[in-house]
Structures are given as structure tokens and as C-alpha cells.
């Protein structure tokens, strides 16, 4: 496994610990809410939650912001644009767009674990326009064509 060093900046509203892996094989690191006052997300509502951190990703890396499964299954709280993408050239505060799909209001307190961040390497491509594509068994079948 390759370890890549990434610069992280604690902002004025930061509190708690830096994102870290919970176990040896965790893919994601928990992001912590850095809101000054509690934020209530009403049922069906979306809120932007600050984390108090900014990062400088190396070229060809992105950060993916994903839901925490416990918040989703227990409270209906998930990341609205999942996965959210943080590009390598973004230097502002990481914020998480949460939506409450549950039936009850939910309060985000400062220091609460609100999402996971996965750091991933990616490749860029160059389009090669073509009048035909190679045939596959699946062909153009989609949206349930391989079974439910």
C-alpha cells in the first residue's frame, strides 16, 4: 500500500481531531462538523455543514465525500450529492451537503461525525471520436437489463 502525504489546514472554526482512518483497512476517514451553533436539518431539508479544514491534494487525486452508513440507516441523513467531489485545485473549506430523508428533524452538533472522505487517484482521458464501438454481450442494455 502506498501512503501519500497531503497538506491539511485547520481553519478558525476547526475543533476535534483531524480526519483519520478508524481501522487498518478503512477506506474512508470521518469528517467532523465544525458549526458554531447546532444546525437543525428538518425532514426533507438540505443543509451545508462546515468541517473546519482545507486540504491541498496532489495532482491526479480527488477527495470523495460519502455518507456515513449509521447516520443514513438510523436517521435518514445522507450526502445529497454523493459522492461529492473535492478537486485537487480546490483550497477552500470542505463543506458537506447533507439531506434529511427521514421523517424527524435531526440536529448536527459541533464535533459530530457527519460524512466520510475517501482520497482517490484518478486518470484523465482524451476522447477519440468514433462512428462505431466494439460489440459486447451486454450491448446497449442498461437500467436493469442484467437482472434485478
UniProtKB/Swiss-Prot annotation:
Natural source organism: Rickettsia felis (strain ATCC VR-1525 / URRWXCal2)
Cofactor section: Mg(2+)
Gene assigned in the entry: dut
Enzyme class: hydrolase
Domain of life: Bacteria
Catalytic activity: dUTP + H2O = dUMP + diphosphate + H(+)
Entry's Gene Ontology molecular function annotations: dUTP diphosphatase activity; magnesium ion binding
Sequence similarity: Belongs to the dUTPase family.
Record protein name field: Deoxyuridine 5'-triphosphate nucleotidohydrolase
Pathway given in the UniProt record: Pyrimidine metabolism; dUMP biosynthesis; dUMP from dCTP (dUTP route): step 2/2
CDD domains: trimeric_dUTPase
UniProt entry tagged with the keyword Magnesium: yes
EC number: 3.6.1.23
GO BP terms: dUMP biosynthetic process; dUTP catabolic process
HAMAP family xrefs: dUTPase_bact
Amino-acid positions noted as binding substrate in the UniProt annotation, renumbered to this chain: 68-70, 81, 85-87, 95
Signal peptide location: none
Keywords: Hydrolase, Magnesium, Metal-binding, Nucleotide metabolism
Role, per record: This enzyme is involved in nucleotide metabolism: it produces dUMP, the immediate precursor of thymidine nucleotides and it decreases the intracellular concentration of dUTP so that uracil cannot be incorporated into DNA.
Pfam families: dUTPase
Amino acid at each position: 500500500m502506498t501512503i501519500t502525504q497531503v497538506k491539511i489546514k485547520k481553519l478558525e472554526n476547526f475543533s476535534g481531531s483531524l480526519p483519520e482512518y478508524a481501522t487498518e483497512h478503512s477506506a474512508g476517514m470521518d469528517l467532523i462538523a465544525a458549526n458554531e451553533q447546532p444546525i437543525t436539518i428538518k425532514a426533507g431539508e438540505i443543509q451545508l455543514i462546515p468541517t473546519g479544514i482545507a486540504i491541498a491534494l496532489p495532482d491526479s487525486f480527488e477527495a470523495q465525500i460519502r455518507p456515513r452508513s449509521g447516520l443514513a440507516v438510523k436517521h435518514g441523513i445522507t450526502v445529497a450529492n454523493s459522492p461529492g467531489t473535492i478537486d485537487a485545485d480546490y483550497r477552500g473549506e470542505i463543506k458537506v451537503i447533507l439531506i434529511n430523508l427521514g421523517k424527524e428533524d435531526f440536529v448536527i452538533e459541533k464535533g459530530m461525525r457527519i460524512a466520510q472522505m475517501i482520497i482517490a487517484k484518478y486518470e484523465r482521458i482524451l476522447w477519440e471520436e468514433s462512428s462505431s464501438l466494439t460489440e459486447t454481450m451486454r450491448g446497449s442494455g442498461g437500467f436493469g437489463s442484467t437482472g434485478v
